[in-house]
Structures are given as structure tokens and as C-alpha cells.
Amino acid sequence: MAVPKKRVSKSKRDMRKTTWKNKASKEAKKALSLAKSVSTGKSKSKGFQIKSSN
């Protein structure tokens, strides 16, 4: 017979949500930083070099 799961406490739920949000925020900052360096031409990454059409 199916038994309902125990309820997760608010503090545990909030902790997990905060962890997820912090990870997402960190990745967003990295992406923005890479976008800025690519747009200014200072990127050292091989995959994101802008070729000039001269």
C-alpha cells in the first residue's frame, strides 16, 4: 500500500533552495564575465576568438 512521504522541514527546504540559487548565481556571473571579455576582445579562450574581416 502506498504511504505518503514525510514532510521536509522549512529550514531544510530553504537550505536546498539557497544552495541551488547560489550555484545558479555563480554560473551566471561566469557567463557574464566571459561575454564581457569576448566583446572587448580580451578573451584567452580558443573557442571564443573574434576574427577580424580585413
Swiss-Prot record:
InterPro entries, A to Z: Ribosomal_bL32 (IPR002677), Ribosomal_bL32_plant/cyanobact (IPR044958), Ribosomal_zn-bd (IPR011332)
Record-given protein name: Large ribosomal subunit protein bL32c
Broad class of where this protein is predominantly found: plastid
Gene Ontology biological-process entries: translation
Protein's UniProt keywords contain Signal: no
Matching SUPFAM superfamilies: Zn-binding ribosomal proteins
Keyword tags: Chloroplast, Plastid, Ribonucleoprotein, Ribosomal protein
GO function term, MF aspect, one: structural constituent of ribosome
Stretch list, region Disordered: 1-54
Compartments, record wording: Plastid, Chloroplast
Source organism of this protein record: Chlorokybus atmophyticus (Soil alga)
Ranges of compositional bias, category Basic residues: 1-20
Bias-annotated ranges (Low complexity): 31-42
GO cellular component: chloroplast; large ribosomal subunit
Top-level taxonomy: Eukaryota, Viridiplantae, Streptophyta, Chlorokybophyceae, Chlorokybales
Protein family per UniProt: Belongs to the bacterial ribosomal protein bL32 family.
Pfam families: Ribosomal_L32p (PF01783)
